[in-house]
């Protein structure tokens, strides 16, 4: 079938990139059994991303995708809003006996998918998927110049049209029945 040929896999099965629960072992297991494993790295640092990719490569020589979050990174986090959110979460957690460590707003670090492009290139990643938005033109150009297959995520016909115009090679379509969050 067309999907299997494009992705160089045996079966047209793509494992969902589930940040927080997916491990290199899961990704490799899917890829080693003929599907396309997907390694989620949205919001992670380049160093952490590199370590996860290298661990996955230790476990498989088959194709796997790396999934990035393409949402905009906030320029400024309002300290009062951040503290109010932490106080609210602390109250909720205390009710259930869960310990919560407060974070200082000035210690927050947000990583953009743009911070990871050079890592993907250096590791010769050939399938890159995106969720929570559309990558910028420069990132698309760099990845395509390195023969990466790009997969976008759409939750509406309008989003699919935008992804198509941007040059995605494939588009994952999610409906309201998607498990967990939706990719927009």
Where are the predicted features?
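Active-site entrance/lid segments in N-terminal catalytic domains of soluble metabolic enzymes
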Residues: 1-184
């Amino acid at each position: 079938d067309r999907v299997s040929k494009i992705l160089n896999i045996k079966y047209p099965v793509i494992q969902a990139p589930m940040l927080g629960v997916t491990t290199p072992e899961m990704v490799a297991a899917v890829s080693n059994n003929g599907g396309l494993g997907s390694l989620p790295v949205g919001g992670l640092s380049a160093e952490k991303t590199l370590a996860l990719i290298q661990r996955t490569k230790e476990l498989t020589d088959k194709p796997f995708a790396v999934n990035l979050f393409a949402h905009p990174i906030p320029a400024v986090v309002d300290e009062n809003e951040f503290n109010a959110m932490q106080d609210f979460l602390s109250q909720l957690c205390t009710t259930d006996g869960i310990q919560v460590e407060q974070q200082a707003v000035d210690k927050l670090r947000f990583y953009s998918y743009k911070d990871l492009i050079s890592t993907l290139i250096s590791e010769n990643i050939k399938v890159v998927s995106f969720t929570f938005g559309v990558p910028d033109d420069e990132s698309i150009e760099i990845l395509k110049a390195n023969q990466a297959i790009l997969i976008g995520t759409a939750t509406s016909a309008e989003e699919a049209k935008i992804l198509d115009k941007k040059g995605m090679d494939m588009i994952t379509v999610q409906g309201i029945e998607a498990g967990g969050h939706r990719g927009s």
